[in-house]
């Protein structure tokens, strides 16, 4: 992510805000959803016609800033395969809005051998 990513998220002053993230396996895939699970071309069109900070339904939790009161109210299920989606669903059920900052692009880190995690 850009060096000022965290500061941009703080400055947005939202309860829950994330950067624009890509899929782990295919960086051309935008990892967020709005009004269901739109196709990639629909996501790009939505973003093109939206302000820099846009309300979404959910995304990956790669670079997400969450205010403490939100975390204190939401029980996070770490064992879920879709823990990020589940977190956003729980937040929305409690009435929280989720925002995404288009000016922050975050990709998964990979080492020179294209591994996501250290070899054991």
State what each model feature region is.
Residues 1-2, 84:
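Amphipathic coiled-coil/heptad-repeat helices and related helical stalk/stem segments
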Residues 2-79:
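Conserved catalytic core of nucleotide-sugar-dependent glycosyltransferases
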Residues 68-69, 73-120:
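C-terminal catalytic/acceptor-binding lobe
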């Amino acid at each position: 992510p850009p060096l000022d990513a965290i500061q941009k998220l703080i400055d947005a002053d939202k309860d829950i805000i994330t950067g624009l993230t890509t899929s782990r396996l295919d960086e051309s895939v935008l990892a967020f959803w709005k009004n269901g699970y739109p196709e990639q071309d629909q996501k790009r069109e939505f973003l093109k016609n939206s302000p820099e900070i846009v309300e979404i339904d959910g995304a990956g939790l790669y670079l997400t800033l969450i205010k403490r009161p939100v975390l204190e109210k939401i029980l996070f299920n770490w064992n879920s395969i879709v823990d990020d989606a589940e977190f956003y669903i729980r937040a929305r059920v409690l009435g929280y809005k989720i925002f995404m900052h288009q000016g922050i692009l975050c990709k998964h880190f990979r080492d020179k051998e294209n591994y996501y995690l250290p070899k054991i």
